[in-house]
Amino acid sequence: MRQARGNIDWQRGWLLLPLLLISLIWSSTADASWDQSLYRQLGLAGKLDKQTFRQALNSYQTVRHKRKPILTIIDYSKPSTQRRLFVIDMKRHKLLYHTWVSHGRNSGELAAKHFSNQLNSRQSSLGVYRTAETYLGKHGYSLRLDGLSPGKNSNARKRAIVVHGAAYANPTHLRKYDKLGRSWGCPALPKEQARAIIDTIKGGSVIYAHG
């Protein structure tokens, strides 16, 4: 009797396996379809690589204690001559900002090729951040960041890696020098846009820096 019951359970398990596989495939397909739909809705074709966008979405979804449905993507794989910062409203599915951003002095000239989590490296850091509080410092209105990627950006606070505005991060500097100026590792924004962007993303939104 026990053997017969065991055989029945074993057979049921095999019958359920295809259903489980179908469910997993459907879930994966649905996620990919949603990613592609949002990518099109935001008008990111030709501006941001699909795979980079998907990685940013995955990172956004894994961050705990988000307090704002805002995702900022920094694509350091692009040169500083291109607008490589994207601020996305994940609730309204809207691209709020698409603008320039500087990288660290020791990360490279035109493009960022070297990244570090070390103090005094003056390099940009990759990975996932959660935005924190604002303050007034030597660069004016600025935004502190907490690095959530161990070994990649976990020293962001100690390194004073913050979002701030800079005159060297705007199109005028770009036209004059054919590249943006560089920071000491901070994602520096065009001065005229910095306050508005900081106010949009401050207080618990997610930043994904790709390179």
Predicted regions and their residues:
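Sec-dependent signal peptide recognition
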Residues: 12-18
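Cell wall/extracellular polymer interaction/catalysis modules
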Residues: 30-184, 191-205
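N-terminal signal peptide c-region/cleavage motif recognized by signal peptidases
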Residues: 23-27
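N-terminal secretory signal peptides that target proteins for export/translocation
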Residues: 1-10
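Low-complexity, Gly/Ser/Thr/Pro-rich intrinsically disordered linker/tail segments
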Residues: 208-211
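N-terminal cationic amphipathic segment used for targeting or macromolecule association
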Residues: 2, 28-30
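Cleavable N-terminal signal peptides
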Residues: 19-20, 30
